[in-house]
Amino acid sequence: MSIINATTLKEIINSTLEHNINIKAISIENKAQQKAFEGVENIYNPTATVGANYSQLDLDMREVQVGNTGTAFLKLGMTLYDGGKNQAIKDQKNFEYHAGVYDTDTAKKELILQVVTLFYQIKTVGDTIKVFQDKGKTLKAQYERVQTQYNIKMTTVDEVLKLQSEYETNQYTIAELKYQESSLIRNISLLANQKINKFDYSTLPDVKNLTLQESTEIEALKMNILAKGETIKIASSVNKPQVKLENSLNLYGYSDYNNNILTDLPTTQNQLMVSLTYNLYDTTSKKRIEVAQLEKLASEERLNFRREEEKMNFDLAKQKLNTQLLKLNSLKSAVQMGKSVYEIITIKYQNGIVDNITYLDALSKKIFNEALYKQALNNYEIAKANYYFNSGVDYKSVLKKW
């Protein structure tokens, strides 16, 4: 795994789209589907077959038999009518290929959302670590102050132990947060298939009023339904007339025969044949048609459900965005209030007006509100990304704005 020094969210996303292993695998599958389509693109072209055979008769040969016969042939064939089977196969592969292209875009969109979520989760944990590190510095300073007072018999040991316990708990919290941060960084590095060393703060553009568009997932489902429609045509084609045209040129060579009797053996023959076949009775084809029809019906129901689901997700994403904005404004006020209360309590604590329980409670509320505010800032960015992509907008146009 190589190392990149990507700093912004956009740089990490671009690197991920280029190097992600799953995306590479999907691209290979798309190429396979394209080759499958190209393989049937010229399905109506004539076929040409060449061959040769040799036969030898031993024992009890009659005078009118040839001992050794060699044959070479060239056969040209063309299907004049196959009940629409070849055209259906061609269309089916075309629809499957385009469904794969849409599926690739869907996978890339989902990957971008994963990266955005992980990026801002990493920022949240990093911001929280800084908040608790600041808390640790404050606790350490207060611990040293109280320890000095204890040494000169101006306070009791429980004051010292309470601050020491709070400080040690804070250090454990920081260690736990660093583990979470490391886990998230490894996850985003796995997606990018590269080790990322640094994460700068990035914000997404403010979201304007978006309208719901059909997503690439919907487009892929529509292509798959069309492909299943062609499967029905393929299954039905066996119950229609089949007309073929064949022309065979045969060259013969002989040895070990009575040339006095067999004087008119042919050396060259050309045979033109037009064949018409019709399937009068076939129970298996009827079942194949029914299976294909049911599969198409199931896909249509799945499409209807997915459309309703996307509409619901879009509405919820918009509601979530508005809720996160309200939460952000509320927490901003809470942070200001917590900071103000803490400053007042600190002065009272240092002057012995309130005890350490009141002081630590004020400090904890201040730290808690600051951590929540940092988290809300990052969750707001995640909500923006979800709103963008749940609208069905093309991920490429979104990235251009970021």
Short names for language-model regions:
Residues 156-158, 353-375:
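Short terminal targeting/anchoring segments
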Residues 5, 372-402:
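Acidic, low-complexity, intrinsically disordered peripheral segments
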Residues 26, 48-52, 93, 243-247, ...:
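Membrane-embedded beta-strand positions of outer-membrane beta-barrel proteins
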Residues 2-7, 11, 108-219, 223-226, ...:
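Periplasmic alpha-helical coiled-coil/stalk elements that build and connect Gram-negative outer-membrane
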Residues 51-80, 89, 246-281, 400-402:
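Small/polar, glycine/serine/threonine/aspartate-rich low-complexity segments that form flexible
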Residues 17-24, 31-46, 74-92, 102-109, ...:
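A glycine-/polar-enriched beta->alpha junction
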Residues 150-154, 349-353, 390:
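A short glycine-centered flexible hinge/capping loop motif at secondary-structure junctions
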